[in-house]
Structures are given as structure tokens and as C-alpha cells.
């Protein structure tokens, strides 16, 4: 049977007080609905039906290039009505898994357990036990077997005492699901077509109904307002921090890091507070990351150090290299083994060779820097002529004095020395000393200007 996933994402989310459709609000820098879509892909779904309504243009702008079947729910008439809009895309032999675009923390392992709990041609529903089930549909059982789900507003006094609640997530056989959806009625307190009513229909038809539960109730919580969104964010971050610690990272304070992507760490990694990881980040063994650092789509080699408040984006930091504090590696930058950039050094589309150093206040862009090079404070590779970018090549063992400008395209030969304050516009041969600074003048008898009285 093919796995066909239906994701309900048509709601406006009025309580968010936002023009953005609710499901596009982010958890860990990714929209809630994208989390759910990614989970569906990880399950091996053969098709994903996205039921949408409010904010269609914004949804399609964000998600439109993905392999989704877009299903319009023009009127929001309940969850049963929403799923029914996808009937034409559901095969009789499909296993249909129903998920929610505002429930982003559901785990693949939980859904695998739900699918495994389902009997052939049976219905499986995900439930959870809550100390306070107020507001949720209750699971009604007879002799231990599920016979139906009753919504809060339709429940009697005895049913309101039930702590096992419906999460809304279920797996059903395609043929029977379409038949049950066709029998739904809106004759209830809400005047809506409840998806939950199909459970009683399944029981009446003698269909096997099984249940599964998540490891944690937070997996099935949704976000209807920004307070709940923040709570889900914290839960996501706590889970991410726990994963990093289990992989071998020491977190100075697990409550004060932000993971916004896929992070892989080696052993004995030390991560200080308020560090942000975004995109795909790979960190080797014995790495130290200082407070306030931001790492985006980058690779950090063994024994490297990222000092406080440095930004590493689409860059590579090699083994035993270091950056910061207050350093910035922009896309295409690479520090080779044992290289170092210090405070207020920026690199872009440039390589700093093994053992080379730029200690402070420098810009290195569109450059190839060899091994054993020292770049003095205030050095700039002048890579842009107003129309095009040009390359600066600095070969091994070059000494660049402070406040030097290298006007690209230019090549500095091996072992050359550039005097402080020089502006280099032509290639420099190996082992040459080049000084271009203006001759110093001494003017005697000079008087400073005096401020005029107003």
C-alpha cells in the first residue's frame, strides 16, 4: 500500500494576529508546515496532499517548488471537510496519514509506531493522556476498545472525565476513508464536519481500530497564538540541545543555544551560551565555540576555536585554526590548518593558508593567501574596481605591514615584505621589500588653528 499523506494547512490563525498564514510561522527558522512536510518525506510518503485556504499566495510563494499536490479548501467547514477535498488524489489501496500543518514537533518514530500499530485495512489513531484534557476530543472506549471520539462541546459529564484525548493524527485505508467522509454530517454544536466522526463509523463497520501514543505530549501540541509558538520553539530547542549533548558536546547552558538546522558534532566540543547554529553545520572533535557566535552552513575542523561573537557563514575553518573574537567569515572563505584571524577581520571568497595570520582590523576578499603569511592590522585587498571583482594572490611567507592596500589584480611573490602604509598596485617579486608610503616631512614653526569665538 502506498503511503499518502494529507496535511491540513487551510486555517487563518486569527489568534496569531498576523497577516501571515498560521502554518508559515517559524519554529527554528523553518515554517511549521515545512517541518511537517519534511517529516512526511522522511516517512517515505509517495504523495503529499497540502490542503490550503487562507493566504494561498504566501503559501505557494514559500512552498510552491516542492513536490506537493495543492488541494484548495475554499470554505473552512471542519477537519472532515478539509480531508474530503483531497479525495480525488487518494487511491483505494492507499494508506492515508492525516497530519496538521501547525503541529510541527511530531516525530518520525511516533508516526512509524502509529503505522505499525494499524491492522491491515484498519484505522489507527494517535492518542495521548493529559492531566487536563479540557478543550480536546475524548477517546471513548468500551471494554478497552475504541468505539468513538466525542468533542468537548458535545461530551456529557462522564465523557468529560476521560483523560485520553484525540490528537487528530490518524492513519486510514483509502477506500473506507473516502466512504466515511461522504457520510459526515454537520449536525453538531460547531456546525462542522468532524473528521473524528469517522471513528464511530469504523466501529460500526466492524473495522479494527488501534491506537498509539507519542513519547511526549509536546509532539502533538499545536500553536494557535504566539505564546504557544514560543513554547514549541523552546521544546524544539531543548530537544536539539539534548541531541548535541548525547553526541559529545558540552553545553555551558543547554537553555541558551539556538539550533536552526542540522548540526553534527564530534567528541568533546565545548559550546558557550547564546550560540546560534543555522543550516547545515558540521563540527569536528575538541572544538571550542565562544559565546554569541553564529555558525551558518559551515564546517569546523578538529581542535579549531571560534571565539566569542564571530560569524561563520558558508565557510570552512580547518584543523586547529581559530577565528575571533568579533571575526567574520563570509561565503567562500576558508582558514587552512592552524591559520588565525582575529578581532574585526573579515574574509570573503578567500583562502588563508596554513599557519597564516591576520590578527586584527583587516579585509581579505577574493584572495589566495599562502602558508606562513602575516597580514598586519588595517590591511585591505582592494578587490572591486566599481564594475568587477579581481583576485589578489599572496604567496608563502609574505609579511604585509599594517595599513597596506593591495589593489587587485596583483600577486605578491614568496617571501616578499610590504612596508606599512603601502599601496601596492603592481606585482611584487619573491623576497622583495616594497615601500610606497609618502616621504615624511617635518614643518617647523607651524601653528595649530585656533577656534574662533562665536
UniProtKB/Swiss-Prot annotation:
Lineage top rank: taxon: Bacteria
Localisation per UniProt entry? Cytoplasm
List the SUPFAM superfamilies. Answer: Nucleotide-diphospho-sugar transferases, Trimeric LpxA-like enzymes
Q: Identify the enzyme class.
A: transferase
Please tell me where UDP-N-acetyl-alpha-D-glucosamine binds in this chain.
8-11, 22, 73, 78-79, 100-102, 137, 151, 166, 224, 330, 348, 363, 374
Q: What is its EC number?
A: 2.7.7.23, 2.3.1.157
Q: For binding acetyl-CoA, which residues are annotated in this chain's numbering?
A: 377, 383-384, 402, 420, 437
Annotated region Linker: where?
227-247
* Region of interest (N-acetyltransferase), residue spans: 248-454
Q: In which pathway does it act?
A: Nucleotide-sugar biosynthesis; UDP-N-acetyl-alpha-D-glucosamine biosynthesis; N-acetyl-alpha-D-glucosamine 1-phosphate from alpha-D-glucosamine 6-phosphate (route II): step 2/2; Nucleotide-sugar biosynthesis; UDP-N-acetyl-alpha-D-glucosamine biosynthesis; UDP-N-acetyl-alpha-D-glucosamine from N-acetyl-alpha-D-glucosamine 1-phosphate: step 1/1; Bacterial outer membrane biogenesis; LPS lipid A biosynthesis
Coiled-coil stretches noted in the UniProt entry, renumbered to this chain: none
Q: Region entry Pyrophosphorylase: which residue ranges?
A: 1-226
Kindly state what the record says about how the cofactor is bound.
Binds 1 Mg(2+) ion per subunit.
Tell me the keywords, alphabetical order: Acyltransferase, Cell shape, Cell wall biogenesis/degradation, Cytoplasm, Magnesium, Metal-binding, Multifunctional enzyme, Nucleotidyltransferase, Peptidoglycan synthesis, Repeat, Transferase
Cofactor dependence is on: Mg(2+)
Location (main, coarse):
cytoplasm
A GO MF annotation of the entry reads:
UDP-N-acetylglucosamine diphosphorylase activity
* Transmembrane residue ranges: none
* Residues where Mg(2+) binds: 102, 224
Q: Which residues form the active site?
A: 360
Q: What does this protein do?
A: Catalyzes the last two sequential reactions in the de novo biosynthetic pathway for UDP-N-acetylglucosamine (UDP-GlcNAc). The C-terminal domain catalyzes the transfer of acetyl group from acetyl coenzyme A to glucosamine-1-phosphate (GlcN-1-P) to produce N-acetylglucosamine-1-phosphate (GlcNAc-1-P), which is converted into UDP-GlcNAc by the transfer of uridine 5-monophosphate (from uridine 5-triphosphate), a reaction catalyzed by the N-terminal domain.
Summary of subunit composition and partner proteins: Homotrimer.
Q: Kindly give the HAMAP family that the UniProt entry links to this protein.
A: GlmU
Its recorded name reads: Bifunctional protein GlmU
